[in-house]
Amino acid sequence: MKAAAVRFLAIVLITLALSAPVAAQSDGIRATISGQMDAFRADDFDTAFGFAAPNIKSMFGTSDRFGTMVRNGYPMVWKNANVRYLELRELSGNLWQMVQVEAQDGSFHYLDYMMVETENGWQIAAVQFLPDPGVGA
């Protein structure tokens, strides 16, 4: 009985130790996405552009062009009413944070944020639309 309790405790401690880095990643990732969402709501595209990874910055070049893309292609993100963080997962070596975004009109949208850790902390390297998980279920 005592050996079983010791094994159980060891498993719990190992699980906690392994999950701690994920929790730390999750906090940093959420802070990055939240910071960009706050900047979008304030129409502060300079700050929002600062959360973009180097590949995105290179693609758009300026915060003005980035802002135009967001306003036209991601209006629910630009003027979001609420953001809910869903699953954080690793796919093919990349970390993807799924979010549910509530738009100003009350509609819900699901997006996946590919996150990269840089010398400046977590940054957003890609965003893609996801199908509504409730559709077709």
Predicted regions and their residues:
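Residue-level detector of flexible, active-site-proximal loop/helix-junction positions
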Residues: 15, 55, 131
